[in-house]
């Protein structure tokens, strides 16, 4: 799955096709075989959801095989998310079309309200937005990306079969203590930020449970090589 948070973001079929071509051109020789080859590499492109996203463009992209999913970034929640969604109410036509098409919505599940503690942003997103989204669009396929809390694990487990979640390797390895061990360690900071040990244990239990609702998400945002 290729994330669409470039600058400018991947919001059209043409932009996704151009980005896919760039990715394929950068493949090392050992990954240059056709998709059917055992070592082949097939980038699955996604569309960046915005307040003014067009349902017809997303439907054409999905039906043509260009878009595999749509990615929801709350505006200013993470890397290159300035163009993200400010109000899910503005996206209802797109979400209804996706529900009809059985097209997955991939969600960075954090609120950006400055009044919410950074360690609570995932939990509050679930309470304020995800619960309502699932209620309003019960057939919508949703993946809650890079979950970091027991709250998210419990929500996904309790939800229907259309709801899943990814878990990153680093959120299985570190808790929030790692950020402050012997001073501030900025290379341990990521978004969503690591949480307390009880949450890490819940993630590990989910990742090793055999429950197909939970699967790997490497969560590497697009950055220039020099960064």
Task: Name each region found by the language model.
Residues 1-82:
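Metal-cofactor-binding active-site regions of metalloenzymes
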Residues 1-2, 215-217:
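Conserved active-site loop/cleft motifs that coordinate metal ions or position small ligands
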Residues 53-72, 78-216:
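Histidine/acidic residue-rich metal-binding segments in metalloenzymes
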Residues 225-227:
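Short, intrinsically disordered, charge-balanced linker/junction segments flanking boundaries
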């Amino acid at each position: 799955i290729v994330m669409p948070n470039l600058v400018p973001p991947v919001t059209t079929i043409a932009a996704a096709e151009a980005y896919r071509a760039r990715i394929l051109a950068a493949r090392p020789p050992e990954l240059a075989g056709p998709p059917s080859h055992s070592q082949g590499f097939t980038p699955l492109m996604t569309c960046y959801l915005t307040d003014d996203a067009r349902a017809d463009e997303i439907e054409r992209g999905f039906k043509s095989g260009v878009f595999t999913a749509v990615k929801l970034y709350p505006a200013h929640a993470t890397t290159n998310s300035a163009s993200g969604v400010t109000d899910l109410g503005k996206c209802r036509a797109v979400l209804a079309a996706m529900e009809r098409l059985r097209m997955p919505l991939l969600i960075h599940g954090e609120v950006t309200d400055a009044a919410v503690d950074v360690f609570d942003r995932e939990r509050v997103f679930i309470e304020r937005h995800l619960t309502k989204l699932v209620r309003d669009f019960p057939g919508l396929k949703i993946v809650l990306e890079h979950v970091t809390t027991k709250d998210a694990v419990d929500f996904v487990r309790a939800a229907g079969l259309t709801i899943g979640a990814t878990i990153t390797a680093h959120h299985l390895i570190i808790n929030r203590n790692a950020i402050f061990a012997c001073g501030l360690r900025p290379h341990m900071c990521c978004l969503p930020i690591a949480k307390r040990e009880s949450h890490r244990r819940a993630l590990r239990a989910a990742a090793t449970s055999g429950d197909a609702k939970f699967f790997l998400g490497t969560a590497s945002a697009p950055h220039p090589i020099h960064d």
